[in-house]
Amino acid sequence: MMRIKDLFPDASGSGRVLVLGELLLDFVPCDSDMRLSQPGTVLKTVSGSSGIYACAAAGFGLDCSFIGKVGSDPFSQLALSAIASRGVRTDAVVRSDSGQLGLAFLEYLPSGRNYTYYRDGSVGSQLRPEELTEAVFADASILHLPGMLLELNDSMRQSCFRAVELAKQNHVLFSFDPNLRKELRNDAQMRQRMMQMLSMADVIEPTLEE
């Protein structure tokens, strides 16, 4: 079983990994030749970069908690059950009586994968900074979040910076994935926010392109 201390000897806390983000549900065609405009069978699978990261961390045997927000809709319940079944703690997830989970529909084109999103105003993007509790950070060792959250909306952006603030106050290492999404935004403000996060990160996980 992997331990945080093996990876980061200077990490404090119990070894718990906190992953902040938005859960999504992907609809993936069983037949790679199927187009979204055609009838066919699809698989539902939990997604969102943070959800995937949390499941991977738990899969390596790490004690991992997801920090985010879900609704009372069936897709929210499915996504929450899916990450819990993979060993991810959900005690830090905020439950809302309103809002819908964001959905993504995938198709395979000759030019590559193509996603059609239904996520504007999704419940997962409505996490508020005051919904983060310091107790969650008290015994943690690492906080991880992806940079694309900074461009969803003001509420999620403020929640990200608040989470980093709580991490620093509790001597929790901050792991940051730039996760650049040019289709969301690419301007001076975005670059400024990205640089601000990078300057606070203890661990940075960029791709070769980034």
Give the ranges of each region predicted by the language model:
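Short gly/ser/thr-rich secondary-structure transition/capping motifs
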Residues: 2-4, 121-131, 184-189
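Glycine-rich phosphate/adenosyl-contacting loop at the front of the ribokinase-like
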Residues: 2-89
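A short, aliphatic-rich alpha-helical micro-motif
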Residues: 11, 136-138, 195-198
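Fold-independent oxyanion-binding glycine-rich loops
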Residues: 20-23, 27, 70, 119-121, ...
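Short, glycine/charged-enriched secondary-structure capping and boundary segments
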Residues: 32-36, 80-82, 131-132, 157-160, ...
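Conserved N-terminal subdomain of the carbohydrate kinase-like
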Residues: 63-147
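Conserved beta-alpha-beta core of the PfkB/ribokinase-like small-molecule kinase fold
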Residues: 142, 148-210
